[in-house]
Amino acid sequence: MMRLNEVIQKGTGCIEIKSGYGLNLEDELKMLRVIQRMKETSKAKIVSTFLGAHAVARGMSQEEYVKLIIDEMIPEVGRQKLADFVDVFCDHGFFTPTETARILEAAATWGMR
């Protein structure tokens, strides 16, 4: 909250905060819940972004992880209304344009932009 208050004092009016380093449902939800609490208590406008597709979780294949994001993570984030937006790290060695489109389409069905 200290950094948040500091940027507010410097004139920032809107702040985007992303999840994305948990790489599993439990940790992604934990980060998004913290962001939700900040949204409820901050004077600034905060938008939350689900970035579960930041990297592939260790021990999973690319397709297994994409399936986890689409079938489990996005629906739970959507049910709890924890994210306004979704982001995908679409780049060589990470998520392909096809995987990115699948993830974005799934998130859109849950109201994430």
Each language-model region and where it sits:
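Metal-coordinating catalytic core of metallo-dependent amide/deamination hydrolases
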Residues: 1, 5-6, 13-113
